[in-house]
Regions:
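Hydrophobic alpha-helical context, especially transmembrane and signal-peptide helices
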Residues: 48-52, 130-136, 150, 172, ...
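Glycine-rich, flexible loop motifs
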Residues: 1-19, 23-50, 70, 77-135, ...
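C-terminal auxiliary extensions adjacent to catalytic cores
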Residues: 1-24, 28-35, 39-47, 69, ...
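Well-ordered mid-protein domain cores that form the structural environment of catalytic cofactors
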Residues: 110-128, 132, 143-147, 167-188
């Protein structure tokens, strides 16, 4: 099994994916253990001094003015975890919780939080045992970090609350820790606060969304090319020189991907005999590279933000190398929240343009010779009429999900925390949007491949033939009389989600970016 080593200098998106989705094991580097011990020494020295230090010997938030006596400080740290574990609603997905815990461990290991090495090791042990704290949908405002979600994770480290075992069964956390030989942690000064105060949940969801959207943008180039081919469109608009004079990098990549898929097609540029030659195609076909390209460039910006966050140590207060413990505002989730919202907008638009191409394939007045709704016997059969309804419903929801969460803010903690990012909410709606986009592109794929097969007298591009063959091998049926459609659509959705479309096409086209 792959092992991820956690050091003091952050982590990578690949490591987050490996831990969250691949179940990779985690080890703390010797450098991290030394940094943890050094920072803990600073906290212990400050705890012994008479003057108050926020997070070490004071209350929290609006209660920070109270100086806490030494005999109450362990209770203070336990209490902050228990009281902040106030989430409600459905459970958050296992991969999100694993990403959240791993990213918190990454910050703890940086040596800027003052957490003891044994607490960090317990975090790694819990992840390695496949124990997943029960975390709920609601409870984070995205400022002072993802407080409630992280608190539920810290509660598990204490042996309290509920968690899911590696067998998928939810049990009391104390039972699961005991079954795996893990001793619950006894928190000391600052440790409870340090386990709660980070943007790890929203960052984990951003990292996973970026991986999913990279796949979906390549998928969208393929489905756009298939639709162009099925509509007998022209590939002249994909010429590199046209995109060079508007030098957005993502646009050129999208056009190149579409060109590679369409290479060798006998359908491209073929016009029905009764039609005048088309000078240009509809916007949803002709402008596909521009829309997908703009989204790709937004992905690139979001990756830059994610990489910076992955290299960050987010806590308040932080332990500095010169021995100071300083309050700061690095827990504010605005940088992550903004790009999460940007990506939801891009996903909505990519889904919107795909739906417009699908509708064009089904409309006999605009499909250039295809039967109405791609039906076998139109009138007796409805073909893919309602598949487009489903796609349209998904697009409509995508538009609602594109409304930014980060423009909202609601004060909390007696107006001490009077501006928040709502980044967790932005991340949650982006996860829904990513799933919807997958389904939208699956419907376009289903319609476009069916339409190409109905052009029986013309030879599709080799890449298109490979896509159709793989889709049929996956159990998605081709043209024919009406049948129960939902199983085909679900199979197409899984085909796209598992990356099988890209895997089928790339042996013909070469790698698609």
């Amino acid at each position: 099994m792959h092992t991820v080593v956690v050091g003091t200098s952050g982590t990578t998106a690949d490591d987050v994916i490996a831990v969250a989705r691949g179940g990779a094991r985690i080890e703390l580097s010797a450098e991290a253990v030394a940094a943890l011990a050094a920072a803990r020494g600073i906290v212990d020295a400050l705890a012994a001094r008479p003057e108050p230090v926020y997070g070490v010997s004071t209350g929290f938030g609006a209660l920070a003015s109270r100086h806490i006596s030494p005999e109450l400080r362990a209770q203070l740290q336990r209490n902050i975890v228990r009281s902040h574990a106030a989430g409600m609603g459905p459970r958050v997905e296992r991969e999100v919780v694993r990403a959240l815990m791993f990213l918190r461990l990454k910050t703890v290991a940086s040596g800027h939080t003052g957490v003891r090495p044994e607490v960090a090791q317990t975090m790694a042990d819990v992840l390695n045992a496949g124990i997943t704290p029960v975390v709920h949908e609601y409870g984070s405002l995205g400022c002072s970090g993802d407080l409630a979600p992280l608190s539920h994770c810290a509660l598990t480290l204490m042996g309290e609350g509920d968690a899911e075992g590696p067998d998928g069964i939810v049990k009391p956390a104390g039972e699961l820790l005991a079954a795996h030989g893990i001793a619950p942690v006894e928190l000391r000064e600052k440790e409870g606060l340090a386990l709660l105060n980070g943007t790890d949940g929203m960052l984990g969801m951003l990292v996973m969304a970026l991986a999913d959207l990279q796949r979906l943008y390549v998928t969208a180039d393929i489905t756009a090319a298939l639709s162009l081919e099925a509509l007998l469109g022209t590939d002249k608009v994909l010429a590199p020189e046209l995109h060079a004079i508007r030098p957005h990098p993502g646009q050129a990549v999208a056009a190149a991907n579409m060109s590679a898929v369409l290479k060798g097609s006998g359908l491209v540029g073929h016009f029905q005999e009764e039609e005048a030659p088309r000078v240009q195609d509809a916007y949803s076909v002709r402008c596909a590279p521009q829309v997908a390209g703009a989204g790709r460039d937004t992905l690139a910006h979001a990756r830059l933000v994610a990489d910076r966050e992955l290299a960050s140590s987010v806590d308040n207060p932080v332990v500095l190398a010169d021995g100071r413990v300083e309050s700061n505002g690095n827990f504010h989730g605005a940088p992550v929240a903004y790009v999460l919202d940007f990506l939801a907008i891009c996903a909505a638009d990519l889904g919107s343009i795909a739906e417009r191409r699908t509708d064009r394939l089904l409309d006999k007045n605009r499909s250039h010779g295809l039967p109405p709704f791609l039906a076998d016997d139109a009138g007796v059969d409805s073909g893919l009429m309602i598949a487009q309804y489903t796609q349209a419903a998904l697009v409509s929801e995508m538009k609602r999900l594109a409304v930014p969460a980060s423009v909202d803010s609601i004060p909390s903690s007696a107006m001490q925390e009077d501006h928040v990012s709502m980044g967790w909410s932005a991340a949650r709606k982006l996860r829904t949007a990513v799933g919807n986009l997958n389904r939208i592109l699956a419907v376009e794929l289903y319609a476009a491949t069916r339409a190409i097969e109905l052009r029986r007298h013309l030879t599709p591009a080799p890449a298109s033939q490979a896509a159709i063959g793989a889709l049929r091998a996956a159990g998605v049926q081709g043209p024919g009389p009406d049948r129960f459609l939902a199983p085909d659509l679900e199979a197409a959705d899984a085909f796209v989600r598992d990356g099988k479309l890209i895997a089928a096409v790339e042996p013909v086209t070469g790698p698609l970016a």
